A protein has these predicted regions:
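Oxyanion-binding/catalytic loops of NTP- or PPi-dependent enzymes
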Residues: 1-87, 92-99, 104-113, 118, ...
Length: 528
């Protein structure tokens, strides 16, 4: 049987794993690194460089080196998150054809799907070099709170990279697979997942080989990048107004400060005080370069980032309430993501749940290992080989789904934390006399008003029979597949006139665009 890989496509770093001879193996690069920066650097007319080599180019090519792109994918250009990113990254973010953010580098504009595809193709190349044979199949993980737009954009990126994406699964769920595999457990588990760009908490019931997600909650714009930004803001506050303006105008200076802030954050898990120094950050009135220096203690750092830590527990409260659990009901605590190595996070999480996290779980690698387990299961089932572990994974949809109705309200058809795959239907009527068509607008979120939720897409059911308002009955069917991706059908109940849509993200690419990008992109020399 061919191999199928599991990919944790992270904001800061990515990991790729495989199950070989019944054992999980995390795949290294040529230098032995098992985590690979999700960084893509574009030179003038050159092939892009990915991974650790790309990180080495960040200072030399700040406007051509793209990082943290996962925070942007699947969002609308005018969203709060994109507006915030435009002011914090050194590369250019520009609006695309579908109101999607794109990256302009030198004389070319790239979709976020292309950026992620370069990272995925790099990881696929590492796997092929490691295994000595072509790799075609993969399971890719996403944050549990990713919406339909973001999930589809990630699947599109996998297809552009030449992968057959067997499944998109949630990161905390993948982590639980790796944690509980082959162990006779019957307990509730909490997976606290704080990565570089996102935070998720999932509550699961593990019963032998059955993994049932009971609830999930998250914040797709809360992660290590925000902790770095908080330290950067502290550093900026120690500069004069003129020097602050210089830093904000200079992509190179902002990048230097970001990397210094990130290093200070890491240092303070091991020492009580660190000294931050950034050479050549600004220029004085005579044009001479000046360094930035400042001391930062662990106590100061904890005070700076406390609001961010508190936000994670507000999300935890939400997930536990939805699961009808308390922290004391949790029998196992799994911590995932590089930020959980931070001392303040470890102490705060242990205090909140009243227990220590599970040992033997590498927070950087566990998601990828879980994805590899699921990849082997799915490929074995698809090919009828009987391979895999025989585990049953029951996941949920993280946010409610519904349609816009008269008055601008959102009528929910599928509630959040519903087990997937799932489907449902609901009957509606026309709202005007002689109405010949109806527009179905699909939204995801918990707000009562449709405009306050995330719009996933729309389609029109035409050819309705002429009748007074309320006489024509329309049945709307919702279906969510195993990837958490939405399909919607509307049908006039009497005539059978129907229209259907596999919701294409309003900010996403068409199937034809994905196909063209897959054929056009040059994946040679990505820096394996």
């Amino acid at each position: 049987m061919p191999y199928a890989i599991g990919i944790d496509l992270g904001t800061s770093n990515s990991v790729v794993s495989v199950i070989r001879n019944g054992t999980a193996e995390v795949i290294p690069d040529a230098d032995g690194n098992r985590t690979h920066p999700s960084v893509v650097s574009f030179g003038h007319g050159q092939n892009p460089i990915v991974g650790h080599k790309a990180v080495g180019l960040m200072n030399l090519n700040p406007q051509g080196t793209v990082y943290s792109s996962k925070r942007l994918i699947g969002r609308a250009t005018d969203s709060e998150e994109i507006v915030r990113a435009v002011n914090s990254v050194p590369y250019d973010i520009v609006p695309g054809d579908h109101n999607d953010p794109r990256i302009r580098v030198h004389d070319r504009v790239y979709t976020l799907q292309e950026i992620s595809a370069h990272v995925l193709r790099y990881l696929r190349g590492l796997a092929e070099n490691y295994l000595g044979e072509p790799v075609q199949h993969a399971v890719i993980t996403v944050p549990a709170y990713f919406n339909d737009n973001q999930r589809q954009a990630t699947r599109d990126a996998g297809e552009i990279a030449g992968l057959e994406v067997l499944r998109i699964i949630n990161e905390p769920t993948a982590a639980s697979l790796a944690y509980g595999l082959g162990q006779d457990r019957d307990e509730y588990a909490a997976v606290y997942d704080l990565g570089g760009g996102t935070f998720d908490i999932s509550i699961l019931r593990i019963m032998g080989d059955v993994f049932e997600v009971v609830s999930t909650a998250g914040d797709t714009y809360l992660g290590g990048d925000d902790f770095d930004q908080a330290v950067m803001d502290y550093m900026l506050a120690h500069l004069s107004e003129e020097y602050q303006r210089q830093v904000r105008r200079s992509p190179s200076a902002r990048l230097k400060m970001r990397r210094a802030a990130e290093q200070a954050k890491r240092d303070l898990s091991d020492v009580e005080e660190t000294r931050i120094k950034v050479d050549g950050l600004v220029k004085d009135e005579r044009g001479y370069e000046q360094a930035f220096t400042s001391a930062l203690t662990r106590i100061q750092y904890n005070q700076i980032v406390f609001p961010l830590v508190k936000r994670t527990f507000e999300v935890c409260d939400e997930a536990l309430t939805a699961a009808r659990c308390t922290p004391g009901d949790i029998g196992a605590l799994v911590m995932v993501g590089g930020m959980t190595r931070s001392l303040i996070i470890q102490e705060a999480v242990e205090n909140y749940f009243g227990r220590e996290p599970a040992i033997g779980v590498n927070p950087d690698e566990v998601v990828s290992v879980g994805a590899a387990i699921q990849a082997e299961n799915l490929l074995g089932a698809m090919q009828g080989s009987g391979g895999g572990t025989g585990t049953l994974l029951i996941d949920v949809t993280p946010q409610s789904l519904g349609i816009a109705t008269v008055g601008g309200f959102c009528e929910r058809l599928i509630e959040r934390n519903s087990a997937i795959p799932t489907g449902t239907s609901k009957r509606f009527t026309t709202s005007a006399d002689g109405q010949s068509e109806v527009k179905i607008e699909v939204f995801q979120g918990e707000a009562r008003m449709a405009a306050d939720n995330e719009k996933l897409g729309e389609f029109i059911l035409q050819g309705l029979r002429p009748a007074p308002r309320g006489d024509v009955k329309i049945i709307v069917y919702f279906d969510i597949d195993g990837d958490g991706i939405v399909n919607v059908t509307a049908e006039e109940s009497e005539t059978g006139q129907a229209a259907a849509i596999r919701i294409e993200a309003s900010t996403g690419l068409s199937a034809e665009e994905v196909k063209d990008l897959r054929e056009d992109l040059n994946f040679d020399n990505l820096g394996f």
